[in-house]
Amino acid sequence: TYMTLTIGFIGNGKSTNRYHMPFILTRKDKIKVKTIYNRSIHFDTWKKIEGIHYTDNLDELLNDKDIQVVVVTLKSSLHYEYAKKVLEAGKHCVVEKPFASSYAQAKELFDLAESKGLMLQCYQNRRFDSDFLTVQKVIESGKLGDLLELEMHFDYYRPEVPESIHEFSVIDSYLYGHACHTLDQVISYFGKPDHAHYDVRQLLGAGRMNDYFDLDLYYGTLKVSVKSSYFRIKERPSFVLYGKKGMFTKTKKDRQEADLKHFYMPYEHVDFGLDTPADYGTLIYDEEGHYHEEKVETVKGDY
């Protein structure tokens, strides 16, 4: 018999309602959300979901014997503090990214979890991005030969974001907020690099948020570059991959986020998150002197 997992949430904002609940609701036979805590729960703008208990009393959630796992989705600066409370209450914990503001904080939490025999993990849904999964499929096909270079881009034109922030905070920076998606993809697939080089900038000047980063990770002869900016009026391709025998370009990012923003939900639509053929990546390679160019069907992403 398959045990139903009973979980609770600390936080009731965009992360809980856009990135967690739609996928939990497709697995009602396996996962039950019992309680959602938020300090301002009675003023939250998100629609309440039937069958879930909403509370502004944290102890009610932490002391509930039925709840096995708690997901922390509060603002980044509160992740460490609340993950610690969850572990101290004897519950398994999943923490939204960025996980913590320092290595020391993260290590303390993992040590605490281990000492109590608890599972602690960071919520890394971006490992299940369709573009990233498709790049893996292309690499594993061997058609590119030895890999030389991988460029990953996560671009926006949102100058109003850095312009509205007038003080520097590590955990609220663009590097922590967005490189946690792309860097996790690199390290989860390629492992720990031989060495790394980073260029992180504050384009609006000292004391402001970092709003640009360019990170290079080296694996033998392979160089992986992770680049991002808030000031790119035309975004660069999501992935460009070069090997000794060819290249693969995937221009469009994973569709799941766009569908979720439009309330096009996975439990209502079988084509949720699916690319159209126009968005498929292009593979170009040399096979014994013959030029090949083909579209690669996108692997379905699944948060």
Spans of features found by a protein language model:
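N-terminal Rossmann-like dinucleotide-binding module
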Residues: 2-49
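Beta-loop-alpha module in the N-terminal Rossmann-like domain of NAD(P)-dependent dehydrogenases
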Residues: 50-112
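Hydrophobic residues in well-ordered beta-strands that form the structural core
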Residues: 56, 95, 120-122, 151, ...
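Rossmann-fold dehydrogenase core element
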Residues: 108-125, 146-150
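Predominantly a Rossmann-like dinucleotide-binding segment in NAD(P)-dependent oxidoreductases
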Residues: 126-199, 203-206
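Contiguous beta-strand/loop segments that form the cofactor/metal-binding neighborhood of enzyme cores
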Residues: 177, 183-266
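C-terminal glycine/acidic-rich active-site capping loop/insertion
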Residues: 245-303
